[in-house]
Amino acid sequence: MRRDIFQAIADPTRRAIITLIALQAMTPNAIADNFHTTRQSVSKHLRILTECQLVKQEQQGREIYYSLEIEKMKEIDKWLNQFRKIWETRFNQLDNVLSTMKKQKK
């Protein structure tokens, strides 16, 4: 089943996993060591992140390493950027209003 990226990142544990593996690939056990939860729970989160292609797995010897799929993160950033631009415009407008009010007080 293909999952929605935004449903995947809605969970705080999965966001924390993304933050962890953004710096370096990690095994499920190494990831689980950073949480107060079971290895099975971390595996479930990794499966969801893998299904929505935010995370990729690579076999190295007997270990599986999970790493961040940068292109999928770029898709999220691109989608969020449209809202970033809207809010930047609104904050700039607010700055202008506040500057005008400040000048009128003097």
Which residue ranges define each predicted feature?
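Short, Lys/Arg-rich nucleic-acid/phosphate-binding segment
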Residues: 59-65
